Swiss-Prot record:
Annotated stretches, region: Hypervariable region: 166-185
Quaternary structure and interacting proteins, as annotated: Interacts (active GTP-bound form preferentially) with RGS14. Interacts (active GTP-bound form) with RASSF7. Interacts (active GTP-bound form) with both SHOC2 and PP1c (all isoforms) to form a tertiary complex; SHOC2 and PP1c preferably bind M-Ras/MRAS, but they also bind K-Ras/KRAS, N-Ras/NRAS and H-Ras/HRAS.
Motif stretch (Effector region): 32-40
Predominant cellular place of this UniProt entry's protein: membrane
Official protein name in the record: GTPase NRas
Keyword Magnesium attached: no
Lipidation (S-palmitoyl cysteine): C181
PTM comment text: Palmitoylated by the ZDHHC9-GOLGA7 complex. Depalmitoylated by ABHD17A, ABHD17B and ABHD17C. A continuous cycle of de- and re-palmitoylation regulates rapid exchange between plasma membrane and Golgi. Acetylation at Lys-104 prevents interaction with guanine nucleotide exchange factors (GEFs).
Pfam families, sorted: Ras
Protein location: Cell membrane; Golgi apparatus membrane
Job description of the protein: Ras proteins bind GDP/GTP and possess intrinsic GTPase activity.
Originating species: Cavia porcellus (Guinea pig)
Length: 189
């Protein structure tokens, strides 16, 4: 069974824990209890493949920012979450993205931009803005509601697909184009 290490990042109060708990336990937690760090595991089938999702739900609060480098090092893919009713959380996405790229020492890291709380009637972040940001980053954008479960599986599963593509690209990339992953020539039949 293939394991995927997913990390949920974003500002405090955007619904990172609510999204994660909705995926794992199928229920909505409406009271706000700031997370320091929680880890969850769930077995799912995505595109016919049985996967083990190892999900790290992180602290959005600034006082825990020192812990970020550590979990960013171990994560394979990142859900970058903002709340559609919180412009500051949207602006903060770039800070998280830059920190991830710095820690991973790569511009090519699997990520999905997630606009949470789409069930709320008032929004301060326009869908078009979010689509444009995601396009400029070259990553998918998905709107979610941890409350109604809209887009929740889609967000996590899309990230798994991004990680799969990244792994395939790494596996198929080589310096001179003739050597396979074991240092031997590959033959496609």
């Amino acid at each position: 069974m293939t394991e995927y290490k997913l990390v949920v990042v974003g500002a405090g109060g955007v619904g990172k824990s609510a999204l994660t708990i909705q995926l794992i336990q199928n229920h909505f937690v409406d009271e706000y209890d700031p997370t320091i760090e929680d880890s969850y595991r769930k077995q799912v089938v995505i595109d016919g493949e049985t996967c083990l999702l190892d999900i790290l739900d992180t602290a959005g609060q600034e006082e825990y920012s020192a812990m970020r480098d550590q979990y960013m090092r171990t994560g394979e893919g990142f859900l970058c979450v903002f709340a559609i009713n919180n412009s500051k959380s949207f602006a903060d996405i770039n800070l998280y993205r830059e920190q991830i790229k710095r820690v991973k020492d790569s511009d090519d890291v699997p990520m999905v931009l997630v606009g949470n709380k789409c069930d709320l009637p008032t929004r301060t972040v326009d869908t078009k803005q979010a689509h444009e940001l995601a396009k400029s980053y070259g990553i998918p954008f998905i709107e979610t509601s941890a409350k109604t479960r809209q887009g929740v599986e889609d967000a996590f599963y899309t990230l798994v697909r991004e990680i799969r593509q990244y792994r395939m690209k790494k596996l198929n990339s080589n310096d001179d184009g003739t050597q396979g992953c074991m240092g031997l020539p590959c033959v496609v039949m």
